[in-house]
Every structure is written in C-alpha cells, then in structure tokens.
C-alpha cells in the first residue's frame, strides 16, 4: 500500500511540473518546442512580410509583446504551445 501511495505521489509531481515553465513552439512542427527562460512568460508568433507572396515566421518566447505593423503581424499568447 505504501509503495502504491508513493508511486502516485511521484507520478502526480511529474505530471504537474511543479516548477513554472512556459513551453512555446519554435518551429511549425507541434512536437518541437522550447522551455522558456524565467521572465519570458508569453509565446510569440511573428509573421514578417518580405514580398507580396513571401513570409518569414518566427516563433518563440518573449517577455513583452510588441505591436503589429503593416509588414509584421504579431500574435502573443500565454498558454503552452499556443503559438501555432
């Protein structure tokens, strides 16, 4: 019984991830993400328009969300892997 209880406690701690860590995508692939450093608690997706039909997309972690402009669309969010 004690072994079962101990196992449940360990599984709970691992699943809850007691340390605060935001996880943000850094590629278009949903399985590839990075754990954000302390202080960067938002995910960002920036779409930069280079030519009429060519775009660069940057994904990652950020502390303060910048504003969008005519050539840059910015999406910030504050849940794990929300910057798809």
Curated annotation (Swiss-Prot):
GO CC terms of this entry: extracellular region
Tissue occurrence: Expressed by the venom gland.
PROSITE patterns the record matches: SNAKE_TOXIN
Entry's Gene Ontology molecular function annotations: toxin activity
InterPro entries: Cytotoxin_Cobra (IPR003572), Snake_3FTx (IPR003571), Snake_toxin-like_sf (IPR045860), Snake_toxin_con_site (IPR018354), Toxin_cobra-type (IPR054131)
The keyword Signal is assigned to this record: yes
Record's keyword terms, sorted: Cardiotoxin, Disulfide bond, G-protein coupled receptor impairing toxin, Secreted, Signal, Toxin
Family matches, as Pfam families: Toxin_cobra-type
Predominant place of localization: secreted
Localization terms from the record: Secreted
Gene3D superfamilies associated with the record: CD59 (2.10.60.10)
Span of the signal peptide: 1-21
Highest taxon, organism lineage: Eukaryota
Disulfide bonds: 24-43, 36-61, 65-76, 77-82
Keyword hit for Secreted: yes
Family according to the record: Belongs to the three-finger toxin family. Short-chain subfamily. Aminergic toxin sub-subfamily.
Role: Acts as a beta-blocker by binding to beta-1 and beta-2 adrenergic receptors (ADRB1 and ADRB2). It dose-dependently decreases the heart rate (bradycardia), whereas conventional cardiotoxins increases it. At 100 mg/kg, intraperitoneal injection into mice provokes labored breathing, impaired locomotion, lack of response to external stimuli, and death (after 30 minutes).
Miscellaneous comment as given in the Swiss-Prot or TrEMBL entry: Negative results: does not affect blood coagulation and does not show significant hemolytic activity.
Protein name: Beta-cardiotoxin CTX15
UniProt source species: Ophiophagus hannah
């Amino acid at each position: 019984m004690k072994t079962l209880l101990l196992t449940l406690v360990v599984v709970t701690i691992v699943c809850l991830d007691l340390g605060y860590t935001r996880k943000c995508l850094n590629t278009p692939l949903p399985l590839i993400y990075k754990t954000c450093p302390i202080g960067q608690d938002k995910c960002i997706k920036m779409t930069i328009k280079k030519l009429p039909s060519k775009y660069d997309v940057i994904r990652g972690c950020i502390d303060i969300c910048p504003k969008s402009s005519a050539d840059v669309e910015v999406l910030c969010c504050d849940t794990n892997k929300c910057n798809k």
